[in-house]
Every structure is written in structure tokens, then in C-alpha cells.
């Protein structure tokens, strides 16, 4: 073998010398005479085994170089001979010899390697609606069934087609968007054995089929000189290849600066924010700014208008005639619209330049953020004749002030002031009214109540009642009694456009003199009938009022205790609690969605709040509001709920207040949104998937440690007053089923700008550890309420909400619960009460205390461990029920309750309120039942919350709440956080 190889080497050297001699002796070849180089061995393909030698010879008078190419990688040599002593699989590829004329010849070499059938080039990208090459060329062309296979035995999409080439790889035809993240292998059969390449994950770049979507934060801006102009353009497209810019129309010069920020949202959505700012705007910066974006499909643009003024302004537009006439007892609204920039700071109505009135509403003309036009309405109700005059609206901002005046004239029916004086033979009638009344005289013989024969007056005088031009006008009319020759009655009638009135004077002749017989104001049968009708109407209204008061009335459930006198609790009137206007939130930044709950007078609506946390962030919230059918009582009750929530402050296990809208429209109370609804229905949904055993997962502790470490900076630096519970991503791979359930919950507390690929809490099973966690969290929340001297009075599973991470939050649906149609609320007196959840002292003596809340908590535990069953099953609330409660009847242990938890229930149901545990003691008892990891989790989450928990106040130690003769009057308004 060695001798044969030596012979070949000798022949090769001899041939090489010959070529050199030939090349040196022959004249140069012209380009037109060039021919293709020749390669030895003269084959298109060469197959060698791994470890063998590759020896290739290129013969050409004008030889330049060898080029080796595989998987897009090139290497070159300038020798005529290419020698690879020990071939490897990576030497598989195309070898090309190129001469000076650019002509070339190629040979493809396969280096057969049993251990490496495929050469791989990663990653794999493809453009939608184009072909893409899976680079997995073979090292052995003699294999069979060279194709693509899905990972883990999964089938490829039915519409996926491909073409295989052993030298290049496999080309996928017409890539579709649905192929994105498709996992596949190159496969082939080698000597009867199926071989797979490393896995490829296809990443599809979307085809551009539409122009970019462009929007701006605001479509118009109004600024004063020196203020900052900042507008953000949002461009949405399928890829980052989109171009964008800001352009000021009709101008090439601008002091504006731009800043770009971009990110991918999902697989086929790319977003870019292009922010344009002018740090100090000037009048000549006014104009139209266009955000322009284009891609290969086309272009799109959107504009925003900037108007810069040298100083602020106020322009007032009365929406009615400024001279107003209104009848006595009627209502009128004085309406003005005004434009103001900056925003108005002061608004006021002045009556007769002396006194102010607050019966007005002021609100933006439009919900648009760019709105500078406002509406102000002064409501004048049941105006009296003395309330006519000038009403002036004043408005001001930091730069200017302006005003407009309305002249209000009250039309009044004439009033007869004097009619029964007979002086020096003259009879005088004096009447006052507006407009000026007209007085007519009538005479009839005898004593009559109404006369019809007209008599002309002797003298008529008109004068104003006061200096003010808005008062009544007084008219004097005089008649000579010599006109009358017989006994009779003289009637004075005064009338104007509003109405009329009359009076009569009866006289008789005695000798030659006339003397007054009787003077009276007309008292007609019509007036008598009116009085009777009015009396009947009053009786009817009184009956309706009585019936209304007998109906169950709504009242705020949560009560804040001020002090205790023996058995009597003195509550703070919630209407007297302060309301801090820092909670105000612009109602035009709320976008309402579906209704979450509704009662007779109120409802809770899902909404999106823009700018509640950050100026450019959206957050899902719950908004409590009144229905149009609500009365004054319900309006006051909703405001009381708002004040109680703002007084309590924030805690992880109550539904926290986020904001409110109390100005310029109906009251709106904005609270945290709990996506999984109330705990009662959650438990009932989970009955079929409940896992009875209690599982300890020590890996969970490490999982939460990692979670909390990742959030440490955000916990310490956060300025929010609540937790933003949006879904996130868990970075720990669970190893067991319980781990999987726990990690999904944890993921909901991690804040990232990516879409989480985790299971939702609502899809996970329920186990005993969850029930213990719920009972523990509710006890913590109730301990917090107790520390704030707040009594809940309606603690039940239906009033516990559930959010991400299976965090429970205590709430009071209040106006938004339809208690009229809820069988849990029973009519007792003039109220509907949750009797089955109430302590005996509350049922029979109407006493609500911290201890009665503990009783209700025991009923809640029974609901919890029965997975949402109704308490006292099969027992209607009737006299028998009340008798059994008095005699000490208590429910048996629910099906899934551990013995220790049933012991807690029984202590909560002690007949003596003073022997019931406090919520602080209940928390300590349950801590012994829950797993160490769950306790550690809750503690860390509570510490991570912006509102950390301090030790709860133990009310049984601080005060003797119920039935103690030793308890004296003690103030409870001490501010302690839990």
C-alpha cells in the first residue's frame, strides 16, 4: 500500500514539473482563448471516509485559487493542489477552482462519518410567504428518506411542503406565520437506522401586508410661552424595519428634540414610541406636527396641533339671554360656557354683588384631555319674588379673571295690600306685583262676593317698591264713593301676566253717610276646594312616607367605633369623617367595561384607569357608582363608604381604595379589581377538583425567595399606595404538580413587560393548604380592621374577593349587592340582615361588636371548609331557628375541616362574647396549622407590600367590649396599623 502511494506521489510531482515547463515556455493566453479549469479526480462528487486523505488537483494555465464552501462559510487556498490529510465531517462541501478569467470548475466532497450524518447551521429564520432553507446538508449521500420530522414525535403542519437537497439542506416552501416557533429535525435512514439532527426552531419574520398604525398621545396642545411641549407618537408594525420621524408642516426649522424607545410585544407586533419635546415653547413654535411612518407596503401619518399663547386667557359665552324672566315658584338654570387656559382655579356666583351661592355645577364640555371649554350651571329653584336681581359668574386662573352678569326678574302674581279704607269719601286699593299690575273696579248692589259692573277709577299711581329695579311694582288706584247711590259691594281686582287677585268692600247708607259694613278678602268655594285637596294630598304623602320608611333601608355595613360605654358602642358618623381630595382622579381617564355586580340603587363596573400609577400606564380597576334610581340616602351612603375606605388606609387583605371622582358628576369610588370574583363562587367551582391532602413543598420556599429577591428594589422604592397585581413570569421550573400550582401563583406577582406563559389561578386545583391560607389571610384582614376600630357586620365568603396569587381581599359590596333578591338576607324589622352569619347578641339585641365579627368569622370558616355550602343547611330562618340558636345549637364540623380548625370555629361560636378569641389570637392559632413555607410566603409578600403590617391591636386586652360592668367610656380612635 505504501509503495503504491509512493508511485502516485512520483507521478504527481512529474506532472507538476511538466505543467511548470509548459507554462513557462508557452506565450500568454488571451482572455478569449480561456477554458474551464480541470479538476482531478474528474468527478462531480467525491465520497471519502472520515480520516482519509482528500487530494484535489486543479490544472489550468491561468490558475488563481481554490475555494471551499459549506453552510455559507468560505475558505481559500492559492495552491493548485488541495490536500487534507485526515478528512473530517466538516470538510464536506463544495470545492471550486477558479482561474484568472473568472471561469471555475467544482467538485462536491462528502466525508462519510457514522457519528455525524448532518452538518448543522443554527438558528433557523424564515420570512412569511417565502421559501427558507433548513441548513442540514448530509455527510453521506447514500442515506434514504432524507426529510423533516417534528420534535418529540409531533406531526408537521399538514400544509408544510419541502424539497430536500443532500448538499444544501431542506427547503421549506411558502413559509406561513403559523409555522412560527415550529420545532423540527432533519432526518434520514442510514443502514436501516433512523437518524435525527439537532433540533431547529423556526422563527418566522412576518410579511408586511399593511401600512404602520400610527397614533399620538394628544391631537392638540395649548401652551403658554415657556412651558414644555411633549407629545408621544406610537408606531405599531409587524417588524422593526419600519421607519419613522417627526415633521413640522410648512417649516424646516424647529428646536424640537426627539427620543425613541422600542420593544417587541408578542411574536408579530413591534412598537416604537417616538417622543418629541420642546423644552420652552414659543409663539412661533405653533403649528402642525406630523408623525410619519413607512414600511415596504406604504406610509401612514398622524398630526397634532400646537398653539402657544403669550399668556393665559378666559372667554365666557352665556348660553342664554342675560336678562331672564321667570315666574314665582319656578326653577331656572343660568348656563354659561367658558374657555380657560390654564385651567380655572376659582369659580363663584355672586348675588347682588353681596352674597355667594354654591348651588352650581362645573364640568368639562368634553372628556377629551385637550379640552379647555367648560360648562357652569347655577341652579335657582322655586324662586321667590324677593330673589330677583343680578347673578354674576366670576372665573379666574393664574393669569386672568372674567365675569358675566345675568339680570333675573321674578314675575309675581299681584297682591292686594290695602283695600278697606274709606277716607274723605275716597276708597283706595293698593296692589303690588311684577310686571306692573292693572287694577279694575266693579260694583254690585247688596252683599256679594263677586261683582261684574265695571266702575272707572278716579286716580291711578304707580311706584317702585324699592330702589332695586328687580322688586315688585306697587300700584295705587282710588275711586270716589259718590259714584255709588245704593247699598252694595265694591270689588277691587288686580291682575298681570302671572295671575290675579281681588278684594271687596261692603257699605250701606245710614242717613246721608256711607258706613262700612264688612270688609273681607274673597274666600271662594274654589279656594275651599283647593285647601281640602291639599289636605288630602298631605295625608297621602304622609302615608307613602311611612310606607317608605318601613321598607328595609340601605346603610353602610362597616362601622368605625369612637368609644364604648358599657354595652353601648358609639359610632362615628361616617358623613363627618374627612375626605382628602388627593384621592380625586379625572373621570375622563376612566373607560368603563362590563358590570361586575348590581343592586337596587348601585353597581360595580370593571373599568380601565389611564395614568393612575404612571402617566402612560393603564390599570384595570373596579368602579362603584349609583344608578339613576338612587335617592339622597343612597348618595350619602356611597360618600360615606368612600370616607370610611380613605380613613382605613391600605392593607393586602382588604379591597383598597385607589381613587374617586366626586366633582363634576356623580360620585365614583375606584377600588382594586379582583379578577377571580368572590370566594364563595370560587369554592363552588373548585369542588370537583379539590385535593384533600395537604402537600408540603419545600422547593416553594426557594421559589419565593428567588421571587422576592427579584422584586427587592421595586418593593423598597415603590411609591404606589397599592400593589399592582398584573400577571408575570415564573423563572423556576416546577418539578411536581404542587410546585406547578404554587409557581403559577407566584408568577402573578412578578412584574415584567412580557406576556406570561403560565397557568391562571382559576385553572388550578384547590387543596387543603389553600383553604388554610384563605382562613389565615381573612383573619389578618379582620385584625387590621379591628385595629382601625372598624366593625364589618357582614363577614361572609360572598364578601371576600380573590385576585392574582390567590390573595383574598375583604370587601363590602354595599349598594352594589341586590340584597332584595338574595336569600341570605332576611327581613327583620326595617332592614334585611344576614341572620345565619350573625351572633346571637346581634340577632336578639341588635348589638354589633368586634366579638360579633369573630362569630361571623367562625361561620365563614364553616363555609370555607365545606367548599361553599350554605350554613345551617336545610334550616329556614324562622321561630324554630331563633329558638335553637338561643338554646346553644351549633353546626357540626364541615367535611374538609381539620380538627384544629373546627376547634377554632367552636371558640368563635361561644355564647359568651368575652370568651371568643380576638382576631390576633386567631391569626396565631392558624399560623400553627399552615405549612412553614406558606407562612414564610405570606410574611415576605406582606413585607414587600408598600404598606407593611404592624402588630394588630388586641381588642380583648385593650377594652372590655361587651357586657362588662367595669368597662368605662374609652376613646378608640387611636391610629394603629396592622
Curated annotation (Swiss-Prot):
Record keyword Iron present: no
Annotated Mg(2+) binding sites: 569, 799, 812
Residue numbers binding ATP: 597-604, 624, 672-678, 798
Record Pfam families: ig, PK_Tyr_Ser-Thr
Catalytic activity: L-tyrosyl-[protein] + ATP = O-phospho-L-tyrosyl-[protein] + ADP + H(+)
Extracellular topology ranges: 26-525
Keyword Glycoprotein attributed: yes
PTM notes: Ubiquitinated by SOCS6. KIT is rapidly ubiquitinated after autophosphorylation induced by KITLG/SCF binding, leading to internalization and degradation. Autophosphorylated on tyrosine residues. KITLG/SCF binding promotes autophosphorylation. Phosphorylated tyrosine residues are important for interaction with specific binding partners.
Membrane topology type: Single-pass type I membrane protein
Modified residues (Phosphoserine): 743, 748, 823, 893, 961
TM spans (from-to): 526-546
Molecular-function GO term, any one: metal ion binding
Ig-like C2-type domain segment(s): 27-112, 121-205, 212-309, 318-411, 414-508
Family in the record: Belongs to the protein kinase superfamily. Tyr protein kinase family. CSF-1/PDGF receptor subfamily.
Protein name: Mast/stem cell growth factor receptor Kit
Taxonomic path: Eukaryota, Metazoa, Chordata, Craniata, Vertebrata
Gene: KIT
Amino acid at each position: 500500500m505504501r509503495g503504491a502511494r509512493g508511485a502516485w506521489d512520483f507521478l504527481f510531482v512529474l506532472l507538476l514539473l511538466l505543467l511548470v515547463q509548459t507554462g513557462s515556455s508557452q506565450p500568454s493566453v488571451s482572455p478569449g482563448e480561456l477554458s474551464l479549469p480541470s479538476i482531478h479526480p474528474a468527478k462531480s462528487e467525491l465520497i471519502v471516509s472520515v480520516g482519509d486523505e482528500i487530494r484535489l488537483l486543479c490544472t489550468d494555465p491561468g490558475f488563481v485559487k481554490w475555494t471551499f464552501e459549506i453552510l455559507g462559510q468560505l475558505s481559500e487556498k492559492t495552491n493548485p493542489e488541495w490536500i487534507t490529510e485526515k478528512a473530517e465531517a466538516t470538510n464536506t462541501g463544495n470545492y471550486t477552482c477558479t482561474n484568472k478569467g473568472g471561469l471555475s470548475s467544482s467538485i462536491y466532497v462528502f466525508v462519510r462519518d457514522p457519528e455525524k450524518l448532518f452538518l448543522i447551521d443554527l438558528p433557523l429564520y424564515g420570512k412569511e410567504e417565502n421559501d427558507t432553507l433548513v441548513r442540514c446538508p448530509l455527510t453521506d449521500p447514500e442515506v434514504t428518506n432524507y426529510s423533516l420530522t417534528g420534535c418529540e414525535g409531533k406531526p408537521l403542519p399538514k400544509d408544510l411542503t419541502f424539497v430536500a437537497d443532500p448538499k444544501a439542506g431542506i427547503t421549506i416552501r411558502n413559509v406561513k406565520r403559523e409555522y412560527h416557533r415550529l420545532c423540527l429535525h432533519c432526518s434520514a435512514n442510514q443502514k436501516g437506522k433512523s437518524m435525527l439532527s439537532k433540533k431547529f426552531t423556526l422563527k418566522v419574520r412576518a410579511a408586511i401586508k399593511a401600512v404602520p398604525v400610527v397614533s399620538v398621545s394628544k391631537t392638540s396642545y395649548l401652551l403658554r410661552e415657556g412651558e414644555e411641549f411633549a407629545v408621544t407618537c406610537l408606531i405599531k408594525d409587524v417588524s422593526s424595519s419600519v421607519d419613522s420621524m417627526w415633521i413640522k408642516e410648512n417649516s424646516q426649522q424647529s428646536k424640537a428634540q426627539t427620543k425613541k424607545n422600542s420593544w417587541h410585544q408578542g411574536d408579530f407586533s413591534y412598537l416604537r414610541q417616538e417622543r418629541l419635546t420642546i423644552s420652552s415653547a414659543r409663539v412661533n413654535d405653533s403649528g402642525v406636527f406630523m408623525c410619519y411612518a413607512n414600511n415596504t407596503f406604504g406610509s401612514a401619518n398622524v398630526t397634532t396641533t400646537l398653539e402657544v399663547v403669550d399668556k393665559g386667557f378666559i372667554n365666557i359665552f352665556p348660553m342664554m339671554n342675560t336678562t331672564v324672566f321667570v315666574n314665582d315658584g319656578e326653577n331656572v338654570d343660568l348656563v354659561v360656557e367658558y374657555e380657560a387656559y390654564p385651567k380655572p382655579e376659582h369659580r363663584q356666583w355672586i348675588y347682588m354683588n353681596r352674597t355667594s351661592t354654591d348651588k352650581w355645577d362645573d364640568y368639562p364640555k368634553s372628556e377629551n384631555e385637550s379640552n379647555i371649554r367648560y360648562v357652569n350651571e347655577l341652579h335657582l329653584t322655586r324662586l321667590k319674588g324677593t330673589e330677583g336681581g343680578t347673578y354674576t359668574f366670576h372665573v379666574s386662573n393664574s393669569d386672568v379673571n372674567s365675569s358675566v352678569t345675568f339680570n333675573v326678574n321674578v314675575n309675581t302674581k299681584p297682591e292686594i295690600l290695602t283695600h278697606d279704607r274709606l277716607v274723605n269719601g275716597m276708597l283706595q286699593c293698593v296692589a303690588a306685583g311684577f310686571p306692573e299690575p292693572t287694577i279694575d273696579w266693579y260694583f254690585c248692589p247688596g252683599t256679594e262676593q263677586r261683582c261684574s259692573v265695571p266702575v272707572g277709577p278716579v286716580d291711578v299711581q304707580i311706584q317702585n317698591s324699592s330702589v332695586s329695579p328687580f322688586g315688585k311694582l306697587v300700584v295705587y288706584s282710588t275711586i270716589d264713593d259718590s259714584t255709588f247711590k245704593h247699598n252694595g259691594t265694591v270689588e277691587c281686582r288686580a291682575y298681570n301676566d302671572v295671575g290675579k287677585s281681588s278684594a271687596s268692600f261692603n257699605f250701606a247708607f245710614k242717613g246721608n253717610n256711607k258706613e262700612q259694613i264688612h270688609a273681607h278678602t274673597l274666600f271662594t268655594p274654589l279656594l275651599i276646594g283647593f285647601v281640602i285637596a291639599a289636605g288630602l294630598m298631605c295625608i297621602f304623602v304622609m302615608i307613602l312616607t311611612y310606607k317608605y320608611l318601613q321598607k328595609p333601608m340601605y346603610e353602610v355595613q362597616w362601622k368605625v367605633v369612637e368609644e364604648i360605654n358599657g354595652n353601648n358602642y358609639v359610632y362615628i358618623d361616617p358623613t363627618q369623617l374627612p375626605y382628602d381630595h388627593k384621592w380625586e382622579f379625572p373621570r375622563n381617564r376612566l373607560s368603563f367595561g362590563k358590570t361586575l355586580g348590581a343592586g337596587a340603587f348601585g353597581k360595580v363596573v370593571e373599568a380601565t384607569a389611564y395614568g393612575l400609577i404612571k402617566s402612560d400606564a393603564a390599570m384595570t380597576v373596579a368602579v362603584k357608582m349609583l344608578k339613576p334610581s338612587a335617592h339622597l340616602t343612597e348618595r350619602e351612603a356611597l360618600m360615606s363608604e368612600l370616607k370610611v375606605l380613605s380613613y382605613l388606609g391600605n392593607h393586602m387583605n382588604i379591597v383598597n381604595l385607589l381613587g374617586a371622582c366626586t366633582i363634576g358628576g356623580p360620585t365614583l369610588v375606584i377600588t382594586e379589581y379582583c379578577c377571580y370574583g368572590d370566594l364563595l363562587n370560587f369554592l363552588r367551582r373548585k369542588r370537583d377538583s379539590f385535593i384533600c391532602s395537604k402537600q408540603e413543598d419545600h422547593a416553594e420556599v426557594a421559589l419565593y425567595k428567588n421571587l422576592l429577591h427579584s422584586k427587592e428594589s421595586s418593593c423598597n422604592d415603590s411609591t404606589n399606595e397599592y400593589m399592582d397585581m398584573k400577571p408575570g413570569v415564573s423563572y423556576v421550573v416546577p418539578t411536581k404538580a404542587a410546585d406547578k400550582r404554587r409557581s403559577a401563583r407566584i408568577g402573578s406577582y412578578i412584574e415584567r413587560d412580557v406576556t406570561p406563559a403560565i397557568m391562571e389561578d382559576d385553572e388550578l386545583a384547590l387543596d387543603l393548604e389553600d383553604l388554610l391560607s384563605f382562613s389565615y389571610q381573612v383573619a389578618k384582614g379582620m385584625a387590621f380592621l379591628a385595629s382601625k376600630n372598624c366593625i364589618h357586620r357582614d363577614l361572609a365568603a360572598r364578601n371576600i374577593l380573590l385576585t392574582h396569587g390567590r390573595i383574598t381581599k375583604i370587601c363590602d359590596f354595599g349598594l352594589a349587592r341586590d340584597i332584595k333578591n338574595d336569600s341570605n338576607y332576611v327581613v327583620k324589622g326595617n332592614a334585611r340582615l344576614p341572620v345565619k352569619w350573625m351572633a346571637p347578641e346581634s340577632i336578639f339585641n341588635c348589638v354589633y361588636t368586634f366579638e360579633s365579627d369573630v362569630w361571623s368569622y367562625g361561620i365563614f370558616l364553616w363555609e370555607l371548609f365545606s367548599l361553599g355550602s350554605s350554613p345551617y343547611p336545610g334550616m329556614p330562618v324562622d321561630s324554630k331557628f331563633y329558638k335553637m340558636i338561643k338554646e346553644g345549637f351549633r353546626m357540626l364540623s364541615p367535611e374538609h375541616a381539620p380538627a384544629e380548625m373546627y376547634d377554632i370555629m367552636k371558640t368563635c361560636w361561644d355564647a359568651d362574647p368575652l370568651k371568643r378569641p380576638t382576631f390576633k389570637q386567631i391569626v396565631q392559632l392558624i399560623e400553627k396549622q399552615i405549612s412553614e413555607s406558606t407562612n414564610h410566603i405570606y410574611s415576605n409578600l406582606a413585607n414587600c407590600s408598600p404598606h407593611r403590617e404592624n402588630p394588630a391591636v388586641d381588642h380583648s386586652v385593650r377594652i372590655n367590649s361587651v357586657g362588662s360592668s367595669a368597662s368605662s367610656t374609652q376613646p378608640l380612635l387611636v391610629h394603629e396599623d396592622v
